[in-house]
Amino acid sequence: MASQTILELWPSSSLEEVQTIIRAVYKQVLGNPHVMESERLVTAESQLCDRSITVREFVRSVAKSDFYRNRYFQSCAPYRFVELNFLHLLGRAPQDQREVSEHIVRTVAEGYDAEIDSYIDSSEYEAAFGENVVPYYRGRSSEANSKQVGFNRIFALDRGPAQIDSAVKSAQLVYAVATNSANAIKASSSTVIGSGTEKRFKILVQGSKFDSPRRISTTEYIVPASKMTPQIQRINRTSGKIVSITEIV
């Protein structure tokens, strides 16, 4: 396996080196796309070139761009959106169902910007990349305090240099994360979505627009993984608050 190239911006970095870092951020955060001139963040690029922002803040600008929002937030299932946020911003796959549920709930309750900020402002991001290292796929090598299954899961999300992440809309780690197990890179042909082998999840919801002013109800929804996205959309339409999402063993 090829070694991982780590790119860092230094005070002495040349303009050519800064441009290399800009291209690397686009590739990492946007999931290896072709970025048209009209889609580039000209202002943020200029700010990075004159050092008025750090690489960390440039990453934030790219992750909050219309490019990222349209391809990953608006076009993908919530579970897939969270998977890719972990991959693009922290360089790893989610470790367990608690992590995924926490981020889905945050996205629903606090919004898109809060979800993106939660990765970039985390102590994990600070420890791994600091202010001026371009995020990279850390799951390709073993690290202290990382779960061994994460080493395998990264390959389910990162299929190599030819992959464009936005081309895959469905979640890749639902079963592996929910059961805290290693995953196969390709789903078994014997596993059929909607069959008895499909994992189910419990969504706990508090309140909705149908509740009386004096009574806030709590409702549990049991849904298969393939139906999670439309169920979350229905909950949002009733103004319900998602309290937790847990896998049913």
From Swiss-Prot:
All residue ranges annotated as the PBS-linker domain in the record: 2-166
Pfam family, one: PBS_linker_poly
CpcD-like domain boundaries: 198-248
Signal peptide extent: none
SMART domains: CpcD (SM01094)
GO BP term, example: photosynthesis
Subunit structure: The phycobilisome is a hemidiscoidal structure that is composed of two distinct substructures: a core complex and six rods radiating from the core.
PANTHER family on file: PHYCOBILIPROTEIN APCE, PHYCOBILISOME 32.1 KDA LINKER POLYPEPTIDE, PHYCOCYANIN-ASSOCIATED, ROD 2-RELATED
Name recorded for this polypeptide: Phycobilisome 27.9 kDa linker polypeptide, phycoerythrin-associated, rod
Source organism of the structure: Microchaete diplosiphon (Fremyella diplosiphon)
Gene name of the record: cpeD
